[in-house]
From Swiss-Prot:
It comes from Alkaliphilus oremlandii (strain OhILAs). Its main location: cytoplasm. Its cofactor is Mn(2+). The keyword Ion transport does not apply. This is Phosphopentomutase. The gene is deoB. GO terms for cellular component: cytosol. Isomerase that catalyzes the conversion of deoxy-ribose 1-phosphate (dRib-1-P) and ribose 1-phosphate (Rib-1-P) to deoxy-ribose 5-phosphate (dRib-5-P) and ribose 5-phosphate (Rib-5-P), respectively. It catalyses: 2-deoxy-alpha-D-ribose 1-phosphate = 2-deoxy-D-ribose 5-phosphate; alpha-D-ribose 1-phosphate = D-ribose 5-phosphate. Its EC number is 5.4.2.7.
Length: 390
């Protein structure tokens, strides 16, 4: 009996603009394809062997004659291209309305309330790149002790503070207060703690980021699996994205390699259910920073670890490699891109060389996991279990 699914989110590894990408300002975006074009190819032999290059319409990765796994790609139904929207849809939620964004900064009354409740003035209150705003306001923050508030094209309120000026505990408390305030009409998908270290002109963000999300708007496959007595293990920022809902055990990570190490540790344990891992570096370190060289290197570093991941699996495990949105590092701006996500599925019980085509929703992943674990579904998406299992 199959009783465990390992789900790897390669954060932002999109594989081509969705049909509605123009509405999101993302015509021509192709995270994987454009990195390959700009950087003279990407060497991903292990993902290639599993079927990555055999996905319909993929650019930059050559197909192999007999891929070992099943493969396909998926459209996004929900109205958005952010982390929360993507992960929630993967887990079985369709969002008709996009989360609210604040491209011109947050309302004055909101900022005033945050300042009153945290007992500090704040800096910033505008849309900005996280690294640029540290260069601009980091020195003033060091001098005044005022946290830096900023946003992006996503539905986020981000709060940056130097770890020697505002302790991590206090920064997390400040973010918790902001989360309570940013509800109702002003609800953003996430409040993000952005701690940093260093000196003026040489600031750098630390891995101690923490996200404070909204509760999912309905039951996810995680909630259902937990209720049915399965383990739901969250590696990386998964716990934050779901606000802890439907999770039985969670561990945070410092980078992709740490995420892979911790996932392998969990695979080798006697658990059953879902191991749900987010590898965030592709997005946070290279996508937003428009660094195709770094992105390529990070993809190749993951690929080198694939044999080790697969060797740790049990005979009845199913592993799915996918993404949550795009973030084309060759594209204009510094924000996510509305793209297809890849689906590469492997296991001893998975039929080799199986093309599952273009899926109509990321929620097909949730439906398939429900089917594999034989638990009730979220009633979103269509299972591809019968297409892939021997």
């Amino acid at each position: 009996m199959m009783n465990r699914v390992i789900l790897f989110i390669m954060d932002s590894v999109g594989i081509g603009a969705l049909p509605d990408a123009e509405q999101f300002g993302d015509l021509g975006a192709n995270t994987l394809g454009n990195i390959a074009l700009q950087e003279n190819g990407i060497d991903l032999p292990n993902l290639q062997k599993l079927g990555l290059g055999n996905i319909d319409g993929i650019v930059g990765i050559e197909p192999v004659e007999s891929p070992l796994g099943a493969f396909g790609k998926s459209l996004e139904v929900s109205n958005g291209k952010d982390t929360t929207t993507g992960h929630w849809e993967i887990a079985g939620i369709h969002l008709k309305e996009p989360f609210k964004t604040f491209p011109n900064g947050f309302p004055e009354d909101v900022i005033n309330e945050i300042e009153r409740k945290i007992g500090r003035k704040t800096l910033g209150n505008k849309a900005a790149s996280g690294t640029v705003i540290l260069d601009e306001l980091g020195e003033e923050h060091m001098r005044t002790g005022s946290p830096i508030i900023y946003t992006s094209a996503d539905s986020v309120l981000q709060i940056a503070a130097h770890e020697e000026v505002i302790s991590l505990d206090e920064l997390y408390k400040i973010c918790g207060i902001a989360r309570e305030i940013m509800m109702g009409d002003n609800a953003v998908a996430r409040i993000i703690a952005r701690p940093f270290i260093g000196s003026v002109g040489n600031f750098s963000r630390t891995p101690n980021r923490r996200d404070f999300s909204l509760d999912p708007s309905g039951d996810t496959v995680l909630d259902i699996a937990k209720r049915e007595g399965f383990d739901v293990i969250a590696v990386g920022k998964i716990e934050d994205i779901f606000n802890g809902r439907g999770i039985t055990e969670a561990v945070h990570t410092v980078d992709n390699m740490d995420g892979i190490n911790k996932t392998i540790e969990y695979i080798e344990k006697q658990n059953k259910g879902i191991i749900f891992t987010n590898l965030v570096d592709f997005d946070s370190m290279y996508g937003h920073r428009r660094d195709p060289k770094g992105y390529k290197r990070a993809l190749e570093d993951l690929d080198k670890r694939i044999p080790e991941i697969l060797e740790s699996m049990r005979d009845d495990d199913i592993i799915i490699f996918t993404a949550d949105h795009g973030n084309d590092p060759t594209y204009k701006g510094s924000d996510h891109t509305r793209e297809y996500i890849p689906l590469v599925i492997y296991g001893k019980k998975v039929k080799a060389n199986t093309n599952i085509g273009i899926r109509k929703s990321f929620a097909d992943i949730a439906a398939t996991i429900s089917d594999i674990l034989e638990i009730p579904s979220t009633n979103k998406g269509e299972s591809f279990k019968n297409s892939i299992i021997k």
